[in-house]
Amino acid sequence: MRVYAGIDVGGTKVALGLFGEDKTLLGKAKFPADPSLTGEAFFRRIVEVLQSKMEELGLPWEQLQGVGVGLPCMIRYPQGQVVLCAMLPALNGFPVKECLEKLLPGVQVEVDNDGHCAALAESRHGAGRGRQHMLFCPVSTGLSSGIILDGKLFRGSNGFAGESGHTLVTPGAGIPCGCGNQGCIQS
């Protein structure tokens, strides 16, 4: 059996799910995100939890075929490198995909912004199924969005379309945001 992992990294927690080829949920785990860790230590911890969960479920490590990671960060896609991560600043500039490919040799790895991941999932398997255009706006520790146009994820000219949490609503005023600006809707 082939096994796939979906990993949702948030500002305060990490959630992962293991799925079979038929998209059946085999198991899941959730643990606190530790913002004090370096990028490498942060993702090494995720891989340790993933390995532990697979062992607990009796799934041989060799069955892991792919890992998808959504992060609350601006991601340079398809390279899978963090550009800016207001929620987890230790990840700024970190090459997530490269790190995971080293930790998970032979496993396909995809890394993207969590709003983009959620919009794609909702458009393919949720309330947006069959729709050509959709806006998905998840609200959690932060605020994000993902845009589906003509049935495809819209990334914009710089790849960061949908970063609605960092839209300036009161430029230079209000609570400072983790991105370095003041006046972001997220703050």
Where would I find each of the regions flagged by the language model?
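Short glycine-rich, Thr/Ser-proximal phosphate-binding strand/loop in the N-terminal lobe
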Residues: 3-48, 81-84, 159
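Glycine-rich phosphate-binding loop and adjoining helix at the ATP-binding site
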Residues: 35, 39-47, 62-67, 73-135
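Glycine/GP-enriched mid-protein hinge/lid loop-to-helix segment characteristic of carbohydrate kinases
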Residues: 17-19, 27-29, 38-41, 103-104, ...
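Short catalytic/binding micro-motifs of nucleotide second-messenger systems
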Residues: 53-57
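Acidic active-site catalytic centers that drive phospho-/nucleotidyl reactions
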Residues: 8-10, 20, 76, 114, ...
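A short alpha-helix-loop-beta-strand transition element characteristic
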Residues: 60-62, 156
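Short glycine-rich anion-binding loops that position phosphate/pyrophosphate groups of nucleotides
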Residues: 12, 72-75, 140-142
